């Protein structure tokens, strides 16, 4: 992995599993698959000494990598059996569900029209993506961005019924909106920041148009990795994640690297989460070297 912070790009050697896809995409008549919408949430907190086993005090990668106040972000390692990017270390997230569009869901924060303007999409798409972001972070790490009113969030999720709801959501047995309505809760979209928009490369057979959100870890709640999609989960600093990726210990994707640089550039978690920028979609593309090796290059979007 080669990161150019000054030029704003990252370049990886293409994994063997995708080389055949790249070669197929270069053939005449190739038509890329239409991407599906997805949402990802970077759950962050301000770190403190000895808060996690992954804490590192110095020796960061790369030398000029910004560290701010050493924010921590919650990351998951996907199980090896996943069809899409198995074993990758990612932020909680997933595909938008058709049932994420319920207009009756009590909603607090920017209206769908405001999100749509920033995201460059329709109001319906914006609504579904924002709801999917909140649903996925609850499904995958047990963090609920909702409360009884616009000024609070649920703090105690220890009752077994919450885990039952998570399982039902993961199995598509209940809609997230229905769960919140039944519990008399309001979706707190004001707790979400909007950071970036990445589209899966055109050579992939599964493609996602993914919006990356941020959220401050709610007080009183505990993030976990109790999902069938993750091998392990924990809080890490961006510098640690970058170092693990460079060493080859972690599989990091281009959007993950870009978003880690965004987190590290923030002075604190609150500042990072308050960011809502108008987005420019970015994507990786293959480059064939003289020796026949394929590299995946990604130019980072300019931050507005």
In which residue ranges do the predicted regions lie?
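N-terminal leader/linker segments that precede catalytic domains of diphosphate-processing enzymes
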Residues: 1-304
């Amino acid at each position: 992995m080669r990161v150019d912070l000054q030029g704003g790009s990252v370049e990886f050697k293409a994994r063997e599993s995708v080389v055949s896809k790249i070669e197929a995409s270069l053939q005449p008549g190739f038509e890329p698959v239409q991407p599906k919408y997805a949402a990802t949430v970077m759950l962050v907190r301000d770190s403190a000494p000895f808060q996690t086993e992954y804490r590192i005090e110095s020796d960061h990668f790369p030398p000029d990598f910004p560290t701010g106040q050493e924010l921590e972000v919650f990351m998951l390692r996907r199980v090896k059996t996943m069809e899409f990017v198995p074993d990758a270390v990612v932020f909680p997230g997933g595909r938008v569900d058709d049932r994420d569009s319920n207009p009756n869901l009590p909603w607090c924060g920017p209206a769908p029209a405001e999100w749509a303007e920033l995201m460059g999409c329709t109001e319906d798409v914006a609504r579904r993506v924002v709801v999917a972001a909140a649903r996925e972070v609850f499904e995958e790490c047990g963090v609920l961005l909702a409360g009884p009113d616009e000024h609070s969030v649920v703090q105690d999720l220890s009752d077994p019924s919450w885990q039952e709801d998570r399982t039902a959501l993961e199995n598509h047995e209940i809609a997230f909106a229905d769960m919140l309505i039944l519990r008399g809760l309001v979706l707190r979209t004001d707790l979400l920041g909007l950071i970036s928009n990445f589209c899966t490369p055109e050579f992939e057979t599964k493609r996602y148009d993914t919006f990356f959100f941020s959220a401050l870890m709610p007080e009183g709640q505990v993030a976990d990795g109790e999902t069938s999609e993750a091998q392990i989960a924990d809080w890490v600093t961006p510098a640690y994640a970058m170092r693990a990726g460079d060493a080859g210990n972690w599989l990091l994707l281009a959007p993950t690297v870009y978003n880690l640089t965004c987190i590290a550039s923030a002075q604190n978690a609150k500042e990072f989460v308050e960011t809502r920028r108008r987005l420019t979609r970015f994507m990786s593309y293959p480059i064939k070297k003289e020796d026949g090796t394929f590299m995946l290059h990604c130019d980072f979007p300019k931050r507005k």
